Amino acid sequence: MGFFSLTQEIAVDLGTANTIIIHNDKIVVDEPSYVALDSKGKLFAVGEQAKMMHGKEHPGIRTIRPLRDGVIADFNAAELMIRGLIKMVSSKHRWFSPSLRIV
């Protein structure tokens, strides 16, 4: 990242079991690929928190594994999961949105 760069570069490795986010050549997020949605389809929990809810959901909450066999099975859930995991990336100077590299 250049001195006057207006973006933060992060890399996202979407995996069926875990999703990893790398920032500044360090793994900053390594979470299970799970998402929990409320009855309106809004994000309730992501990663480890959503995995702990799996199989124990409240009637208004459902857990989803958006990737199956290395392929995105639920695009909406995958997008919500990625957005939730990106929010976990801590940065003191988060003035600009990240530039993503998905592998």
Q: What is the predicted function of each stretch?
A:
Residues 1-5:
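A short acidic-Thr-Gly-centered motif at the start of a beta-strand
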Residues 7-13:
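Short glycine-aspartate micro-motif
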Residues 16-103:
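Conserved phosphate-binding loops in N-terminal lobes of ATP-dependent enzymes
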